[in-house]
């Protein structure tokens, strides 16, 4: 039962990150003027990062009894999301507010890279459920 809960938490993490990062921003910019879409995203991202931290931490705890590697990977996602939310996101917002496009581009690129790595790691953890440790 714990493995099923761990799988669901990890799938929620993976799907939520993909949907939010690949879908929400594109959708908002397609239906709203850019300044309004940017404001909406600015309000959404703190919640997104809390979702990532919570679902990754839950997955880490739930999978730990059966797979310490997956647990460590999910814990790493949760832990590395903290500075992304608390340091990088405010720096991106400050660059936007200052009109510093170069700094925004660098910082936003870093946040995208972090999210891509998180998605790939969560995907790897999901794949590990198909071949559990010690399995054939």
Which residues does each PLM region occupy?
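Polytopic transmembrane helical bundles with strong interfacial aromatic enrichment
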Residues: 1-136
